[in-house]
């Protein structure tokens, strides 16, 4: 089965790795000219980390992220309102990580290229439109500064955010 993923963000890249784990070879179309480490810090809860660990990424993430130990809320004068343990300190089998969003995306992109090959992520490829028949999905894609191309896949997953086609 040939699967296209529109969007090379955290969701699209994670999906590509999950599909590869079950024997499929998806292709990710990302309109940005390259995967860049942009964004802000995020907290990834143990439920998400468990999924990423199942994809074999725990060691890579642990080497660049901060294990979040405690969540603390304080008043403006510094008095504790609440303090709660997080991740392994809260009894989960995996940590909660604080990580830069772009660094997480980089780990995912590197894993996709390592496992599926350099053609698995097509950066600089904007999905313009798609049409579906009983047998296939046709994608109209414009590579950066080039002529529109058509690709045929069995399925298309939209992971391209709020401006999705």
Predicted regions and their residues:
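Active-site beta-strand/loop signature of hydrolases that rely on acidic residues for catalysis
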Residues: 16, 30, 157
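Conserved N-terminal helical subregion
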Residues: 3, 47-165
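Glycine-rich FAD pyrophosphate-binding loop
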Residues: 20-40
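Beta1/beta-strand and adjacent pyrophosphate-binding region of the FAD-binding site
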Residues: 1-11
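A short, Lys/Arg-enriched amphipathic alpha-helix followed by its capping loop at the start of a domain
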Residues: 15-24, 51-54, 115
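Conserved N-terminal glycine-rich FAD pyrophosphate-binding loop of Rossmann-like flavoproteins
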Residues: 34-53
């Amino acid at each position: 089965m040939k699967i296209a993923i529109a969007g090379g963000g955290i969701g699209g890249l994670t999906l590509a790795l999950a599909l590869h784990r079950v024997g499929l070879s998806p292709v990710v179309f990302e309109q940005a000219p390259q995967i860049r480490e942009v964004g802000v810090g995020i907290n990834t809860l143990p439920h998400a980390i468990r999924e990423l660990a199942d994809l074999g990424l725990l060691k890579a993430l642990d080497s660049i992220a901060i294990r979040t130990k405690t969540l603390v809320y304080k008043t403006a004068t510094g008095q504790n309102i609440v303090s709660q343990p997080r991740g392994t300190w809260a009894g989960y089998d995996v940590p909660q990580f604080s990580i830069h969003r772009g660094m997480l995306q980089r780990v995912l992109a590197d894993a996709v290229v390592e496992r599926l090959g350099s053609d698995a992520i097509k950066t600089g490829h904007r999905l313009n439109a798609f049409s579906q028949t009983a047998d296939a999905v046709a994608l109209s894609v414009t590579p950066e500064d080039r002529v529109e191309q058509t690709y045929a896949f069995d399925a298309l997953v939209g992971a391209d955010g709020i401006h999705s086609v």
